[in-house]
């Protein structure tokens, strides 16, 4: 058998999409929900999904039959209940919207020069099926794959490391070879110069193992995310399979806590949903990378992919940028949280979906744990222990190198009843329940815990718990980023507005997203983000913000996931002479605050003050200045809006139809200070080799369609997202408003 090419080609371009009686041309990734306005009157996804339409859609694409003994289509994610047809014949299907799947289309392809047609039918009409914004459609990449009949299996290279020291490390490579031919076959597998012959019967798969040594290994860590590459060759394939991996070791116990590469490490984590904010569920690589960059900049070292498998690009970014990950499989199990959620699939699909996640992701050094569930409803039933064991067993069938966890919670007094459930887990996940740690540790001194969800306002208490008790190895705030769906979580409200929590009867129809993130939809870090980062890290020594006076816009009421409205603003017109609180965050022992160069006061700062100094003073416009040791920060009253300032996150776009640029729009005064209360209607105009993907603000009550060219700034900010075309050339983005036109160019 001669060597043949094994190829993988991006299959995102040139689709025709039909929905709601209309057909349009689209390039993937695609989410049809985000092109609609959130509408509480008609949105089938309800308050959980942000009031979007969902429904059914159909994608079609014509393509020539490629060369290769086997031809497959690999889908990174379709939401949801996908059926794949080729030339009128059903080739495959997949139900769960968050796991990848592959369809062998070889038997259905034309053998002549006729073009083939693939049709993907997407059914997201059974609502409600998700507790957050899922999006609808082929929202992740699709790949066209070709390979010989005898080939390296999908996800068939598994790299682990052992015997790690500063002098050397052992690399273990397990290669699974698959024979899809009707006859027996043989091939030679080569890894790093070592060879083994493998013989396979028709339809058989076999694994062969290799090991080699790296001298003076460069260890992977969040501070130094160094990656190696191993090349695997098969004699029937004429190109090697390259796999990136990291050399790192970690351990956890009740005495030393979490230890990475021999060094204790406190885990400062964030829960992050799958959506990409203003562009909805469309999982462009650049959007996924941006999420990781934002979390890294906010001081986090751990992300929990709540509550579903994430994308390949997201994990690649975590590997290369240095971010630890808990990979989560499911939200719920057998008892439904929503009428059409995973409870309708679990018995028939759980093993397939867990394998899809773990097999794809197990080479990522960023992943330190697998999570099998979140706040399952049936948690008090004894049968839940059996379910947990089955799910854990499915994980261990693919990867025995990482601990299995699960997030549990209780809204009543029956906590100890979960002990048999916790016994199944390697690390116990506590949602909002870490205050039970002392009694639980006394009852079960071997239990290692982490808080898998916590309220944003509990930042100091949660940091202190992890800092003081090694058996509590980390905390994960809900959430790192604002997200679509779970409408109104994190909101505060004023007297006269609809009261209550986001989950109140009827939901919060004024909202279509959750504002509990440390970082908002535009990428702006809220003051709570700076405070949290100051607690956990040493690179944010001083920060200052101002608490909104109660009564300035009305009497303020908080909800469970909210923090008091606090802003980088010294613009409080009409409040002159009235008391206002200025907060300064630092680990320095003393802070001085000045207003207009006059000393307001000096305050001691320590753990007893939660590393926070609060000054109450009568409001007067001008400039605040805080000093702590050698550090100084200022906050000045902004003048009237004078212009728009546009700032892009990159200077060049790649002409591949996949490259995104995020352009921040800020309303500034003549001195360049952001006007923190500016709400100015704007229109974006994109010329050249890019198209507009989205224009929106962080206001999750704004009903403007996010893909429209119109948006109103919120707190002086908005964000524009543009997508490259397939042609090289300059891109010009202009924004019109009542202020002078602002323009920025990108190559």
Question: PLM features: what roles do these ranges have?
Answer:
Residues 5-74, 130, 135-138, 150, ...:
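Extended carbohydrate-recognition surfaces in non-catalytic/accessory domains of CAZymes
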Residues 11-14, 28-49, 96, 107-173, ...:
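An acidic-aromatic loop/edge-strand motif
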Residues 13-20, 49-50, 54-154, 180, ...:
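Accessory beta-strand-rich segments of carbohydrate-active enzymes
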């Amino acid at each position: 058998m001669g060597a043949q090419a094994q190829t993988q080609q991006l299959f995102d371009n040139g689709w025709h999409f039909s929905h709601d009686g209309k057909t349009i041309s689209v390039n993937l990734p695609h989410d049809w929900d985000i092109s609609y306005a959130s509408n509480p009157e008609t949105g089938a996804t309800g308050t959980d999904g942000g009031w979007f339409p969902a429904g059914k859609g159909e994608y079609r694409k014509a393509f020539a039959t490629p060369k290769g003994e086997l031809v497959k289509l690999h889908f990174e994610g379709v939401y949801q209940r996908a059926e794949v047809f080729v030339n009128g014949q059903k080739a495959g299907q997949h139900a769960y919207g968050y796991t990848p799947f592959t369809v062998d289309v070889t038997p259905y392809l034309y053998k002549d020069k006729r073009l083939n047609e693939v049709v993907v039918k997407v059914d997201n009409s059974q609502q409600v099926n998700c507790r957050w914004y899922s999006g609808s459609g082929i929202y992740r990449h699709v790949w066209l794959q070709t390979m010989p009949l005898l080939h390296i299996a999908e996800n068939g290279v598994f790299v682990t490391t052992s015997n790690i020291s500063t002098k050397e490390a052992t690399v273990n490579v397990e290669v699974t070879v698959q024979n899809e031919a009707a006859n027996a076959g043989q091939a030679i597998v080569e890894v790093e110069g070592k060879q083994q012959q493998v013989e396979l019967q028709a339809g058989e798969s076999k694994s062969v193992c290799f090991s080699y040594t790296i001298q003076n290994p460069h260890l992977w860590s969040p501070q130094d995310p160094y990656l190696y590459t191993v090349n695997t060759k098969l004699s029937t394939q004429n190109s090697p399979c390259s796999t990136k991996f990291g050399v790192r070791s970690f351990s956890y116990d009740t005495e030393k806590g979490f230890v990475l590469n021999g060094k204790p490490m406190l885990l400062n984590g964030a829960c992050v949903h799958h959506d990409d904010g203003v562009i909805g569920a469309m999982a462009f690589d650049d959007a996924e990378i941006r999420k990781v960059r934002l979390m890294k900049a906010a001081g986090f070292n751990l992300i929990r992919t709540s509550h579903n498998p994430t994308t390949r690009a997201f994990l690649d970014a975590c590997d290369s940028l240095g971010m630890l990950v808990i990979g989560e499989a499911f939200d719920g199990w057998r008892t439904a949280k929503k009428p059409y959620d995973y409870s309708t699939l679990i018995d028939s699909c759980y093993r397939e979906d867990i394998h899809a996640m773990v097999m794809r992701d197990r080479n990522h050094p960023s992943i330190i744990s697998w999570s099998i569930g979140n706040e399952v409803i049936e948690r008090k039933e004894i049968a839940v222990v059996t379910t947990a064991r089955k799910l854990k067993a499915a994980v261990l069938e693919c990867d025995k190198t990482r601990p299995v966890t699960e997030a549990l919670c209780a809204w009543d007094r029956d906590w100890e009843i979960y002990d048999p459930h916790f016994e199944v887990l390697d690390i116990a996940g506590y949602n909002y329940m870490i205050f039970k740690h002392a009694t639980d540790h006394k009852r079960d001194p071997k239990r290692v815990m982490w808080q898998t969800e916590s309220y944003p306002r509990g930042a100091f208490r949660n940091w202190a718990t992890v800092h003081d008790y090694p058996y509590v190895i980390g905390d994960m705030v809900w959430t790192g980023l604002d997200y679509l769906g779970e409408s109104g979580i994190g909101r505060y409200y004023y007297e006269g507005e609809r009261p209550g929590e986001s989950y109140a009867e009827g939901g919060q129809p004024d909202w279509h997203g959750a504002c509990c993130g440390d970082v908002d939809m535009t990428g702006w870090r809220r003051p709570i983000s700076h405070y949290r980062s100051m607690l956990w890290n040493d690179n944010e020594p001083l920060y200052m913000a101002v608490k909104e006076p109660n009564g300035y816009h009305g009497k303020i009421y908080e909800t469970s996931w909210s923090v008091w409205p606090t802003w980088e603003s010294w613009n409080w017109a009409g409040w002159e002479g009235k008391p206002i609180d200025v907060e300064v965050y630092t680990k320095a022992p003393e802070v001085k605050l000045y207003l207009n160069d006059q000393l307001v006061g000096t305050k001691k700062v320590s753990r007893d003050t939660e590393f926070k100094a609060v000054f109450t003073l009568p409001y007067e416009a001008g400039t605040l200045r805080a000093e702590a040791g050698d550090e100084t920060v200022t906050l000045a009253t902004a003048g009237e809006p004078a212009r728009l300032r546009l700032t892009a996150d990159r200077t060049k776009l790649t002409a591949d139809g996949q490259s995104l640029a995020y352009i921040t729009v800020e309303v500034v005064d003549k001195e360049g200070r952001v006007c923190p209360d500016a709400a100015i209607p704007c229109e974006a105009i994109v010329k050249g080799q890019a198209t507009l993907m989205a224009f929106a603000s962080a206001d999750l009550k704004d009903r403007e369609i996010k893909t429209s060219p119109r948006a109103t700034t919120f707190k002086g900010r908005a964000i524009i997202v543009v997508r490259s075309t397939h042609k090289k050339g300059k891109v010009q983005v202009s924004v019109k408003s009542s202020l002078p036109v602002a323009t920025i160019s990108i190559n």
